[in-house]
Amino acid sequence: MVAITLPDGKVRQFDHPVTGLDVAKDIGPGLAKAALAITIDGEMKDLATLIDRDVNLSIITAKSGQDALELLRHDAAHVMAEAVKELYPETQVTIGPSIENGFYYDFARPTPFTPDDLAKIEARMAEIVDRDEAITREEWDRDAAVKFFEDAGEKYKAEIIASIPADQKIGLYRQGNFIDLCRGPHLPSTAKLGKAFKLMKLAGAYWRGDSRNEMLQRIYGTAWFDKKELDAYLHMLEEAEKRDHRRLGREMELFHQQEEAAGSVFWHKKGWTLYRAVESYMRRRLEANNYEEVKTPQLVDFSLWEASGHADKFSESMFTIKTQDERHLAVKPMNCPCHVQIFRQGIKSYRDLPLRMAEFGSCHRYEPSGALHGIMRVRAFTQDDAHIFCTEDQITSETIAFCQLLKEVYTDFGFTDVRVKFSDRPAKRAGSDETWDKAESALLEASKAAGLETVLNPGEGAFYGPKLEFVLRDAIGRDWQCGTLQVDFVLPERLDAAYVAEDGAKKRPVMLHRAILGSFERFLGILIENFAGRFPLWLAPTQVVVATIVSEADDFAREVEATLKAAGLRVELDLRNEKINYKVREHSVAKVPVMLVVGKREAESRQVAIRRLGSQNQEIVALDQAVATLAAEATPPA
């Protein structure tokens, strides 16, 4: 007998081995028609997988969320590769995974693909869907698989398979005349893919991601379960392009970047004003929550990174220097080992804990040129970093306090939709399994006490401990991982951090690594795109522009400017001999939230015309009233 336990706890008994499709049919014809794949004891498998033992099973349909989408997109990559091989037989296939919101496949061919080619490939994909080709898994001996692909002129596939141990069976998937190396799972047929897909763009990619290898051609695409979802995604992309922080950064004169300092940011006056507004806000928040702000060195002897374990995990991302006296230094990629050095100065008592140590720490990490993206992916960045040294008994209370602070900060910046991931132990880690068991248990219990609903993010913890990842959803539905909280029993041990416990014994503190923004640069990029440059008044680099209609109003305009500045507002004065409509357009492009327009009549009556960004209307009010209203609006959150 084979006992199949379903997600609702019901058990179905079979007197013979069955496939996932058999189980779906046994439940009902509607489910059998909708079924795409199955999970067996949590692992996704093909619908045709034969089950000959007792298992926990769930059936994947189009309504199964991200698992179903990843399955669909993986199949879209294979169907695209099949279409390319039919249209351009001389092309060699390499790899084609699903990725966030889509898929890609890398191809090797002498002639570059063109946008016209993408249209042809997309049309052929639709034909393959109409053919309803069965997708079946086959297991081959490794050497036979290598020979098959070599004979087919597919040297890249042959190279991948040749790197697999000789005694390991190779999984291949066949659809029509197309055969590809793949772990699976896949849909049961090409018809299940549907036609809510689109090929998006072309790009270059090195074979195996190594710049010493051949350059391949990558085709990106997206796939969804229905056209409505596809259209919504394409609309979001259009909106995202309008909000691109790189374009708005230029238009608003916030920052620029150039090749001579790749991965770094040249902050212009307005951009630096925005940066400092965020920094000042965060500093007030930290002070109100009893954090000690510190500053640690940029250059630190490499031996500290070896002692901490970072050298083993991050050496390829670190900028290092050999000095004239043969010292090996590293520009710090993170702040945590340096904070431990401050903690170790002097004797610490249990009465000193929790000790909350914060730093707006400048860090540097090497990123490949192709991975750099505006100010969101850089090599030089500043973290809103803090480390809480506490006892094991204080983990829960400190987690609750941090989560409350994080929620308040995100709300003040306009983010109310926040999801939380729990990232457990990675394969490559420091510390014993016992230490990790304790750390994971402590963080899970603390997150529950803080009222958090977490989703497991397996294997994505830091090398020294598990972590919570806080993911913001922006105005157009995109997710951004920003905040983190990590429980660390390892680093205090490695770097010999200790405190005197109540019984006089020497004990290791627990170290909570936490950040809210992540990095200032990336968070500012997110803010620019979330608000499309239309910042709330308290954040706007220039909060008010005072613009004249006629030169007779210049003196009054200067008085308005001075009065606003005295009230703490960031003001620009525009006395140029230009038409007011021209001035309005120019300052609208710069996303200035408020314009105060003054002409001869306003100067005589000591009034101003308030014109807000995006509105065609203006309100005539007395100067004192305007200043009071705007000063209140521009006051940063407490």
UniProtKB/Swiss-Prot annotation:
Top-level taxon in the UniProt lineage: Bacteria
PROSITE patterns, per database record: AA_TRNA_LIGASE_II, TGS
Note describing how the cofactor binds: Binds 1 zinc ion per subunit.
Residues given in the record as Zn(2+) binding sites: 336, 387, 513
A GO molecular function held by the record: tRNA binding
Region spans: Catalytic: 244-536
Keywords of this entry: Aminoacyl-tRNA synthetase, ATP-binding, Cytoplasm, Ligase, Metal-binding, Nucleotide-binding, Protein biosynthesis, RNA-binding, tRNA-binding, Zinc
Cofactor(s) this protein requires: Zn(2+)
Keyword Nucleotide-binding included in the entry's annotation: yes
Quaternary state and interactors: Homodimer.
UniProt name for this protein: Threonine--tRNA ligase
Organism of derivation: Paramagnetospirillum magneticum (strain ATCC 700264 / AMB-1)
Gene from which the chain derives: thrS
